[in-house]
Amino acid sequence: MSKVYDWLEERLEIQAIADDITSKYVPPHVNIFYCLGGITLTCFLVQVATGFAMTFYYRPTVTEAFASVKYIMTEANFGWLIRSVHRWSASMMVLMMILHVFRVYLTGGFKKPRELTWVTGVVLAVLTASFGVTGYSLPWDQIGYWAVKIVTGVPEAIPLIGSPLVELLRGSASVGQSTLTRFYSLHTFVLPLITAVFMLMHFLMIRKQGISGPL
């Protein structure tokens, strides 16, 4: 193993990278509330893992979605546990994100020179809420159906562009298969990809600028 490590070290300078990560200065005022962002990231990773596992069984059609979720909960090995963890971590992610935003605001972490870090954080907060909206519809039960119908109907009040926007969200004039397909694609591919990009930007800026000092 040492020869393998030496070979990698010679080419990648692993030790230098490890030293840079572990030797980063942490201000003395940092407390447990500064861990809320990291907990949010952990919840996101749990979401990715459990969500990926459920894609093996979930069927995004209006005729099979509910039955496939029922199969996950009652017949698939550990399916009930995986889906339950997915739901619990989703709620935890939203809660930790809200608390993280409050912590940053109350401690002035959004001030110069960290304005862009705050902006990317706000975008991540919107993306987190979007995960909740799109994921809520996927079981395609009564609650999910009517939630989607109400949420996608809200933009209709916007003058001129309201109706076209509603049709864009739903995929048609009414809520149906096109709507479920759109929400499934958003929830499992588009939103995770965008979230990963903004998280990378967010963490790189934190890494570069460091943790903000006390007020």
Curated annotation (Swiss-Prot):
Transmembrane segments: 32-52, 90-110, 116-136, 186-206
Subunit text: The 4 large subunits of the cytochrome b6-f complex are cytochrome b6, subunit IV (17 kDa polypeptide, PetD), cytochrome f and the Rieske protein, while the 4 small subunits are PetG, PetL, PetM and PetN. The complex functions as a dimer.
Miscellaneous remark of the record: Heme 1 (or BH or b566) is high-potential and absorbs at about 566 nm, and heme 2 (or BL or b562) is low-potential and absorbs at about 562 nm.
Protein name: Cytochrome b6
Function comment: Component of the cytochrome b6-f complex, which mediates electron transfer between photosystem II (PSII) and photosystem I (PSI), cyclic electron flow around PSI, and state transitions.
Gene it is expressed from: petB
GO biological process: photosynthesis; respiratory electron transport chain
Entry membrane topology: Multi-pass membrane protein
Positions annotated to bind heme c: C35
Binding site for heme b 1: H100, H202
Residues bound to heme b 2: H86, H187
NCBIfam families per UniProt: PRK03735.1
Gene Ontology cellular component terms for the protein in this record: plastid thylakoid membrane
PROSITE patterns hit by this protein: CYTB_NTER (PS51002)
Cofactor, free-text remark: Binds 2 heme b groups non-covalently with two histidine residues as axial ligands.
